[in-house]
Amino acid sequence: MRAAYACDPMATRGRAVVEEESAHRSPFQRDRDRIIHSSAFRRLKHKTQVFVEHEGDYFRTRLTHSLEVAQVARTMARALGLDEDLTETVALAHDLGHPPFGHTGEDALSALMAPYGGYDHNAQALRIVTHLERHYAEFDGLNLTWETLEGIAKHNGPVAAPLPWALEASCADINLELSTHASAEAQVAALADDIAYNHHDLHDGLRAELFSTDELAGLPILKGCFAAVDQRYPGLNYYRRRHEALRRFFGVLVEDVLANARAALAEINPQSAMDIRNAGRPIIRFSNGLFADLQVIRTFLFKRMYRAPSVVEMRTQVTQVVEDLFPFFLETPSELPRQWRKDVEDVAGDATQLARIVSDYISGMTDRFALQCHQRLIGGAQDGTVTGPSTLNFGA
C-alpha cells in the first residue's frame, strides 16, 4: 500500500521533452528500463570500486554493486510504503558517473579538472542521463522524470554552492530544488548504497586476505553477529560461518534503518512527498548508535583495506594512467573518437570546454579500456608493461 508521503508516478512533475505515456509501464518503470538499457549502465560491468578489474573476477564491480543496492533499496521501499520503482531507479543510476578505477580514478580526475570546474560523480551521473547518452531521435540523454533526476542529483542530501559545473549545466533548464532534501525513495537508495558497500567491502577484504574473520569478530555489530552464528551453529566451517555472520550484519543494518525511519515518520507525520523534502533533515538514516559503530568499522577498513600496501600500489599506478591520458587528449584531441571530435570542433578555442569534453570521455572509460588506451597511446609492450611518464606493470 502506497504511503501518503510516497512519490506518485501518476503525479510526476514530468519530463523535459513531453512523451506519450506507456500503456504498460509507469513513468518510473520507464526510467528504470532506460537506465538499464543505457550504454553507461553496461559499462559499469568493467568498472571497479577498490580492486582493479584484472585482480580477480570475484570482486565486486560497479554493476554488481548497483544491482545489490537496487535489491536492498526495493525491499526497504516496500517495507516503508514507498514507490519501489522510483527507489530502484535511483539505486541503479547512483554510480553511473564514476570514472574508471573507482574512487582513485575520481580523485585523479577531480584534481585534473579543478581549474575547469571540478569533477563530481553524482553531477556526472546527471550529465550522462541529461546529455551524454545520445541514442534517441527526439532528445539527448534519457529524458527521465523530474523525480528520478532529483534523486540522482541529491540522494545524499541538499547540494550547496558552489555547484560542480556538470550539475550546474544539467540544472540550467530544470529546477531540481537542490537546497531541499530528496524524496524518501532517493533517501532509501542512498542508505541502501551505504549498507551494500559496508557489507561487500568486508566480504571482498576477507576474500583478498587483507584481514581475518577473527579480526572482524572483534568489531562492533560484527561481534554479536559472529556470536549468534557460533551459538546456533557450533563447529560450522570457516566459509559458512563467515557468510552467516556477514548475512546477519547486513540484516542488522537494514532493520536499523527501517526502525529509525518509522520513528522519524511517526514524529513528523508527513502527508505528502513534499513534506519529506521540506522536513529539514533526512528521514531515512541510521540510528546514532549504529552510525557510530559503522564509523569504527569504516576506520578499520580504511587502515586494513583501502590503505593496504597492495591497494596503495595499485592506486599509484592507475592514478598515473588518468594523469597521463588527460593532458594527452587536451594536447591531441584528434585522437578522440569521431563523435567526440565533433564536440571539440563545436568549442574550438575554448580550453575549459575542451577539458570538460576530455573529462566526459575519460570518465566513461572502463578500467580495461583505460589501461588499453594508455598502452596504445602513451606507450607499452605486449607483456602488460605500460611505459611513458612512468613505468606501470598491471600484470595478469
Swiss-Prot record:
GO terms for biological process: dGTP catabolic process. Keywords: Hydrolase. It comes from Jannaschia sp. (strain CCS1). The keyword Hydrolase applies. Gene3D superfamilies: Hypothetical protein af1432. GO terms for molecular function: dGTPase activity. CDD domains: HDc (cd00077). Pfam families: HD, HD_assoc. Signal peptide: none annotated. Disulfide bonds: none annotated. It comes from the Bacteria. NCBIfam families: dGTP_triPase, PRK01286.1-1, PRK01286.1-3. Belongs to the dGTPase family. Type 2 subfamily. This is Deoxyguanosinetriphosphate triphosphohydrolase-like protein.
